[in-house]
Structure formats: C-alpha cells, structure tokens
Amino acid sequence: MGSEIPDYYNKTLASENNTVATRNSGFPVWEDYKGSVDDLQYFLIGLYTFVSLLGFMGNLLILMAVMRKRNQKTTVNFLIGNLAFSDILVVLFCSPFTLTSVLLDQWMFGKVMCHIMPFLQCVTVLVSTLILISIAIVRYHMIKHPVSNNLTANHGYFLIATVWTLGLAICSPLPVFHSLVELQESFGSAWLSSRYLCVESWPSDSYRIAFTISLLLVQYILPLVCLTVSHTSVCRTISCGLSSQDSKLEENEMINLTLQPAKRSGPQAKLSHHPKWTYSFIRRHRRRYSKKTACVRPAPAGPALESREGRPPGKVGSMQSQPPPSNKFMPGVPTCFEVKPEENSDVPEMRVSRSIMRLRKRSRSVFYRLTVLILVFAVSWMPLHLFHVVTDFNDNLISNRHFKLVYCICHLLGMMSCCLNPILYGFLNNGIKADLMSLIHCLHVS
C-alpha cells in the first residue's frame, strides 16, 4: 500500500494467472477509465510539479541547516534531519513514478523497477512516519524527565537504525508479490496495441487484505495514537508546570509589592532584624477571601530581649498593621492579623509578572503547534489509507471513470505532508530556524 499506485488492473486481472491479458478495444471500462484523468492531466502535472519542488526544496534546506552544526545538535534535531531526508526520498520515489503511471496507463520502467519501486515507495513513507513517532517519544521523555535526560547521539543512531530496519522488514513482501503483466488490446483477430502494467499479485485476497490492514495500523493508526498521547502529555506537563510557576511568581510579586515602601508615604518604619522575626504575606482562597493577611511569629518574651530589640514594627512600608496586644503573643505560635492600607497612600495594584505572561504565551504556542502537527498528519494521510481499504474490500464502490482522479487527490494530500513537515518541524524550531537563517544569509552573500 504505502504510497505506491494501487493499480486499477489489480482488480480486473486478479483472476489471471498468465503474463498476458487480452482485452477488447471496444470495452467501455477502458475508455471511461482513461477519461477520468485526461481532462485534467495538465493541471495534475502542474500540481504534482509544484508539490514535489516545494517538498524537495523545503526538506533540503532543513537538512542542510541541521548538517551545518551537527556536532552541536540535540537528538530531536538529529531526528528532524533524518525526517527531512526521508521526505526527500518520498518526493523523489513517489511523485514522478506515480504520476507517470497514472497519465500513461502503463508501466514504463521495466520489470526490475516493477519489483523495486513499490518497495522503495512503501519503505520511505513508513520510515518518515516512524520518525515522527520517534520525535514525539523523545520530546515526551525530555519533558517528563528534564533532569535525568541523558539522550546522546548514540540513542539517535539507534532510533534511526531501528526505524529503517522496521521499515524494510514490514515492506519486504512487496518485491515478492509484484509482477509485470502485459495487457494487449485487440479488435477481432487483430492485435492493436500492448502495454505493460505493474500489479500486485498476491496468492489470495486474504493476503492482500491482511497486508493492507497491517499497513493501516502501522502507518496511520499507531502514529496517530502515539502523537496524540505524547503531545497531550507534553501539553499537560507544561500546563501543570506553568500553574505552579504562576502561583510562585504571583506570591513573590505580592510580597515585593507589599514590602516595597510607597514613594509618597510618610516616614517609614524599619523592620526588625531579629532572626526569629519572620514575615510572610499570603493570599487566602479567592472564592472566600479577598483581603491580605500577615502571619507574624514573635520572638520569645523576655525583659532583656525586649529592651534590646524593642517591639515588632507596627508599619510595613505604607501598610498599617494592627496586631493584638503584645502580652497575648505566645512564643513560637504564629499570630495572624489583617493588613490594611493607609487611606491616603497609593498602594500599587497586583499585576501579573512579565515572566508569567511569557510562560503563558509560550505554553499556548506549544499547544497550538502540537495540535497542528496532529491535525496535519491525520488529515493528509487519512484519505489515502481509506482509499486503499475501500478498494481492497469493495472495488466497485468507486466508479471506473473517477478511480484515478480520486486516487490522485488522495495521493497529493499525502504528498502535502512532505511539504508541511519542514515548516512544522524545522521553521518553527528556534534552533533550526536560526541555523536556517544563517544558511540563507551565507547563500545570499556568496
């Protein structure tokens, strides 16, 4: 399956055991089948050319940017470079051969290429998908274990070797079960023309359906589940970290604003420097309380200590405190009292720190980007996989006239992922983006 063309003649020649199939030239299905694409062949050529050039140039730039400073790159950047390389192979192997077979209605590249090319097409698409899973897993590991994150270049090499091994192993049946079939057109006893078709020749339909379902699971459902679970966990971890950081920064902000003297206030009282006097300002539950409170832990009572250190301050900056009488303080027991601002003083309002705003903005950016990654993968590859499943189980569901046109649309959507991956994984990566801008500047200067 993968990205190779599921030749229309697989279903019409499935019962043929010979290498030559005869078809009458007046057979209406043949003409209907050709007419679906002939009307749009120039549009398809232009669209395939645009998508191929865009995917090739975008992935080539990302690959060059990653290779410029490969000794300083992380495991994620190493995987992104391999993703760009695999997408280049997808563009080179899938677009030209598929478009040629669709427009010419025949296989022009010989028997050997009939066995090799579907295999290479399937492998490159599968490897690209498995690398997406690897990137998601590595990002999840880095977010969940930031302190113990010890991924090295050897881990990247191991992941790439595993990905290519799995791709080659899963797609290995394709070279065996592809064959070149000669299709001849005749009119009565006269032979008009002949053409060769590269078709899948499975021992039975059950083998073909089993292989299609396997590729559906490995190439689409498993990656989609992994991307969704991994990116959801990453977003949740970032959100939890942001909440704790938010509350910590708000508390520090409130303490700073409370302890900072007002500029237009009167004489300021000095805080006691006794080590056992501590001040901590807290904000109670927002739903029940709206006032600030202060908890003061006084020093142990004693005449000598009181004569040296004096009483605790009654003012903190521009804030007027009203504690209970000193004879009611109990040593070692915090006493909470209300902190009220002076009537004529300008108390700065509580404002959200710029650090919190930056963290929130970054969290939203990460959430949107990961959501787009999932949607792009799901939308771009879903039509092609559905097309393969539908045609394998019910080949009459799509009319003969529109068969190729529907396939080309599904195939182009899959190719669009190769154009969008450089943007989503490269241009939106700050490190790769900086290297890319430097590379473009060097190319422009030279």
Swiss-Prot record:
Cross-referenced PROSITE patterns: G_PROTEIN_RECEP_F1_2 (PS50262)
UniProt superkingdom: Eukaryota
Record Pfam families: 7tm_1
InterPro entries given in the database record: GPCR_Rhodpsn (IPR000276), GPCR_Rhodpsn_7TM (IPR017452), NPY5_rcpt (IPR000393), NPY_rcpt (IPR000611)
UniProt cross-references to Gene3D superfamilies, sorted A to Z: Rhodopsin 7-helix transmembrane proteins
Lipid-substituted positions (S-palmitoyl cysteine): 442
Extracellular side: 1-42, 99-117, 178-208, 391-407
All ranges on the Cytoplasmic side of the membrane: 64-77, 139-156, 230-369, 429-446
Residues annotated as glycosylated: 10, 17
Keywords: Cell membrane, Disulfide bond, G-protein coupled receptor, Glycoprotein, Lipoprotein, Membrane, Palmitate, Receptor, Transducer, Transmembrane, Transmembrane helix
Entry's Gene Ontology molecular function annotations: neuropeptide binding; pancreatic polypeptide receptor activity; peptide YY receptor activity
GO biological process, alphabetically ordered: cardiac left ventricle morphogenesis; chemical synaptic transmission; G protein-coupled receptor signaling pathway; outflow tract morphogenesis; synaptic signaling via neuropeptide
Annotated transmembrane regions: 43-63, 78-98, 118-138, 157-177, 209-229, 370-390, 408-428
Annotated region (Disordered), positions in chain: 297-325
GO-annotated cellular components: GABA-ergic synapse; neuron projection; plasma membrane; presynapse
Topology versus the membrane: Multi-pass membrane protein
Compartmental location: Cell membrane
S-S bridge residues: 114-198
Function text: Receptor for neuropeptide Y and peptide YY. The activity of this receptor is mediated by G proteins that inhibit adenylate cyclase activity. Seems to be associated with food intake. Could be involved in feeding disorders.
Record family assignment: Belongs to the G-protein coupled receptor 1 family.
Protein name: Neuropeptide Y receptor type 5
Taxonomic source organism: Sus scrofa
